[in-house]
Each structure stands twice: as C-alpha cells, then as structure tokens.
Amino acid sequence: MNDVEIIEVAPRDGFQAVKPLIATERKIALIEELAACGFRRLEIGSFVSPKAIPQLADTGEVLRRVRLPAHLRIQALVANARGLEMAMAAGVRELVWVISVSESHNRANVNRSVDESFKAFETAWAGLGRDRPWLRLGLSTCFDCPWEGRVPEDNVVRLVERTIAAAPEVEIAICDTTGRASPDHVGSLFGRLMRRYASPKVTFAYHGHDTYNLGVTNAIEAYKAGVRVIDGAAGGLGGCPFAPG
C-alpha cells in the first residue's frame, strides 16, 4: 500500500506548546476548520493533569461542543489510569497512551520510571476487558533524550515487544520528541521494527518534529521503511513542554 494517512495533531501537540491560553471557542473553531480539510483522523487533546498542561484542561468541553464530520476519527492522549478514566467518561473511543523510552524524560513527564508507567498501562488495559477502545501506544524519545542523548535502538525494541504482549492489536507511534533524529537513525530503527513486528494487527506510525529542518526528510525515511501513518501539525506547531531545548 502506497497511500499515506496524515494524522492532524495540532489540537493536542500544537496547542500544548502555546503558552497563552487559547479560548475554548477559538479551539473549537480551529478544530472544525482543520476537520474541513479532509483528514481522516485528528488528535483532539489530552486528559492529563491541568497543572501540568493547563492549555488542554478543557479537552472534555471541546469534545462535547465541537461539531465534526461523521467520518473523522477522533483520538485523545492519556498518560495514566486517571487520564484513561476521564477519556472513557468523555466518550473517547480512540486512545493514545504515551510512555517515554528514556527514564529521564518519563520522570520529567509523569514522575514515574518507565517500568512503573508500563505496569500502570498493562494493569489498566487488562482491566478494561471487552470495553477497550482502539489503541495507539505512543513511545516518546525513541531517538533522542534531552538529558540522556541518543536512545539505544534496543531500548525501543524492548518496549515495542512489551507493548505487543500487553495489547496484541495496536498502533505504535515511534516518536522523535526533540526533533533531533537523523534520517539514517529513522531508517535504521523503522527498518528493524517493520521487518520484525509489523503485521495486520500491529502497525507503526511516525511522530516527528522539524526542530532542525529534518521533519520531512525523516518522514520520508519512515515511509521508505514501510510506515504509512505519519503525524503532522498545522503551522508546524508542537513540542513537548517537558523537553528542554
């Protein structure tokens, strides 16, 4: 398959990078305008601590009020069991659960070790039983960590294997959180993952940033490796509030 699905993530990744609070009404208007562009999937926000990311504290209200085409798939991000509860209560049926590969970034992001975050995910996911939503597991810092530098590919592979063991039907987003990934690194990691793990039940997505003007080049390398789901954000907005530099 040569078609590429572009996921519009500006309402989550983009908005969270904007410091002045955006009025809920303005967010709704922008999201409806983005939906009119013809995307098939949109990441509308996140259910996380409002103290950590106040910009997205109104995600539930946005979901209630926004008017979107029936064909548009809506996904929302969570990072723990509490976020999962909030998302499910808000009617979210497509979930993005994020865990960092690097210990330092995961602690900065959710104040837990990687193992603690994964155990929380495994427990919460198993507890849903048949009421599970569609799942994307977002692995942050797959290439670079602001504190630890280059992330070993083996570390990513281990978490991919753990993800598949817990959720055999899953989309796994391989994320270049800082935008420091090089094209050869992207090609190498995705080549390894696609050859070994890609299947009709396990798909991979690429989430990158254009910090060093390599966003498009890296996306092309992911495509060459077989990836057909790529995140994008209107206006190039985006960035992790917990990743300095």
Report residues per predicted region.
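Hydrophobic faces of well-ordered beta-strands that scaffold small-molecule active sites
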Residues: 5-13, 40-44, 72-78, 95-97, ...
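Active-site mouth loops of central-metabolism enzymes
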Residues: 6-28, 72-81, 106-113, 142-155, ...
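N-terminal small/glycine-rich loop or linker at the start of catalytic domains
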Residues: 1-19, 96-109, 132-147, 189-201
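N-terminal capping/small domains of soluble enzymes
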Residues: 1-82
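Catalytic alpha/beta core domains of metabolic enzymes, predominantly
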Residues: 175-245
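Conserved anion-binding
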Residues: 102-161, 165-177
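Glycine-rich, proline-tolerant flexible connector loops at the mouths of alpha/beta enzymes
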Residues: 40-65, 99-112, 141-148, 173-183, ...
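Alpha-helix-loop-beta-strand connector modules within alpha/beta enzyme cores
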Residues: 52-76, 115-135, 158-163, 186-206
